């Protein structure tokens, strides 16, 4: 069976998607919550003000996908197709998402909520967490080399359990690197 290919299309609000390869498509205000995108391909697509919470992503391909003002609660990015996996997030809710063992170097998270998000064993080299809330996010054996946390907040990262060489942190965020020592740091 031949796979459907859609290029330069705009999808608005309540349109349903079928399994296909979507390239340079834009999705505006769509509610895909609890849907199944298994095997779908999204190449250079933009999602604006969309709800993808709890969507199944088994072998889903995201290549240079952009998410803006979107709700992505509980997504399992760790089940996506690894080939070319790349995306950026601007003003998105990614609480309870999983990036476990993903290789997503240079990913930009801007103004995002990433509470209880799992980054264990992920490669986030050169990634940026710009003004992101990382409360209870999981960083274990994560590669964070050259990552930028200067404006991120509420994170706890154990430098002994993660690779943080040349990562950038602000003075205000240093306490998040020392949490395991249970020391009082006064401002």
What do these predicted regions represent?
Residues 1-187:
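Tandem repeat scaffolds
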């Amino acid at each position: 069976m031949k796979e459907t290919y859609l290029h330069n299309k705009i999808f608005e609000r309540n349109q349903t998607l079928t399994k296909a390869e979507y390239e340079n498509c834009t999705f505006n205000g769509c509610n895909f919550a609890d849907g199944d995108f298994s095997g779908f391909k999204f190449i250079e697509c933009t999602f604006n003000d969309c709800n993808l919470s709890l969507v199944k992503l088994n072998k889903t391909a995201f290549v240079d996908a952009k998410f803006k003002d979107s709700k992505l609660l509980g997504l399992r990015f760790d089940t996506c197709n690894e080939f070319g996996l790349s995306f950026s997030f601007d003003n998105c809710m990614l609480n309870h998402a999983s990036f476990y063992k993903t290789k997503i170097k240079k990913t930009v998270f801007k103004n995002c909520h990433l509470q209880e998000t799992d980054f264990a064993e992920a490669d986030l080299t050169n990634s940026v967490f710009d003004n992101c809330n990382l409360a209870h996010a999981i960083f274990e054996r994560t590669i964070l080399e050259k990552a930028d946390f200067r404006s991120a907040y509420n994170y706890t990262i154990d430098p002994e359990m993660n690779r943080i060489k040349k990562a950038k942190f602000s003075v205000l965020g240093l306490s998040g690197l020392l949490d395991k020592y249970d020391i009082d740091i006064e401002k």
